[in-house]
Amino acid sequence: KSFVEHSVYKLAETSQVQDRRLEFVLIDSAQLNAFAAPGGIIGVNGGLFLYAQTEAEYASVMAHELAHLSQRHFARGVEAQQRMQLPMMAALLGGIIAAAAGAGDAGMAAIVSTQAAAMQERQRFSRQNEQEADRIGILNLEKAGYDPRAMPSMFERLMRQYRYDRKPPEFLLSHPVSESRIADTRNRAEQYPGNGVQDSLRYQLLRMRVQLFYEESPGMAAKRFRGILDENPKLDVARYGLALAQLKSGQLEQARESLQLLLQKTPNEVIYNLAVIELDTAANRLKDAQERVQRLLKLYPNDYPLNQSLVDLLLKQNRSSEAEKVLDQLIKTRPNDPDIWYQIAETRGLANNIIGLHQARAEYFALVGDYDQAIQQLDLAKRRASNNFQLASRIDARQQAFIQEQAMIKQMLR
């Protein structure tokens, strides 16, 4: 998630997007898809990293989506875009997140309604919209320092791969690829110098992590990586993949050996260290894991994955009050992150702060689109706060805001 945020903000700086207050949601799906919606909502499937073979290809997809956003291809005809940010976020993405988080029927119902609304909106895309997004996206890629040829290259590969497929990825249904579109993007890309960034080690490491996340046979993957390393032992990405495969298959000491070889080269590389932290946690070496996290946080105090790792470790050691302090700092910079609100609810529950627990749950449920649950949680909070007029009034005001947002969503989906 941190990589997506930083990379999209980098693209946004050179894009035509005027309001760069963006909200990000990563969707746990191996299917290829990414989209940008009104209110600055950026959605990315894990599958994008599986299909985009280089960082420039990944950036080409995101630049294309930012172009849709900047030209308001989704939002034309929608009034008061700024006021609609949170409701639109919940309507378009909430059901998917809720289902992924185990919210069951509520999540699935939201998915059905939001997919229908999204499909209606996407059917309005014209060939002109896609050409405009391609043109602006290529310009943005070049300005951001990437090789714009990555866009036609990825389109061409996807067209060859899914030319005769009856069930192509959702991205290709909403963004159909044709010979003429590929030719047009290639002609535009060729107008720029070919000296932009194609790829990076960081992207390949993250891509490897996503691949191993969806890998169903880590033992077979480890065998494959060993074969690659036998031929070329200097391939750090393959060694990282081997370490993750070993970790996933329970070969903890072998994974440690693989990671140590990588850390000898770059001891402060966050990606490698996060894998060691995961390894130490799996081996119940929580003190070692926490010492590593705290050492790295001195170097990278604002690193989101490191802060999340610290919270997880503190909770595993029943140090909920310390975990909540870390989360309180995180939520100041990420107020619309449902993952953080979920963890805040957990820490408040462990601290027996029941009113705070219900308030945090309400924020979480609202962000994942389940307003009924959010409103219900605030009902429970108000009952507990009945003897505190000021607190009860604040809770009631928040509840009324949720009721209004829910009404706006229902009106939008009619």
Question: What label would you give each PLM region?
Answer:
Residues S2, A117-Q294, N302, D370, ...:
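Extracytoplasmic and endomembrane cell-envelope/extracellular-matrix remodeling and assembly machinery
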Residues V44, S60-H68, R72-H73, A133:
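Active-site recognition of the HExxH zinc-binding catalytic motif
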Residues G46-S60, R124-Q128:
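Short pre-active-site segment immediately N-terminal to the catalytic Zn-binding motif
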Residues A56, L66-R83, A101:
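Catalytic Zn2+-binding segment of zinc metalloproteases
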Residues E179-A183, N284-E291, N318-E322, L350-A360, ...:
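Alpha-helical linker/edge segments of TPR/alpha-solenoid repeat scaffolds
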Residues G241, A275, S309-L310, Q343, ...:
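Canonical tetratricopeptide repeat
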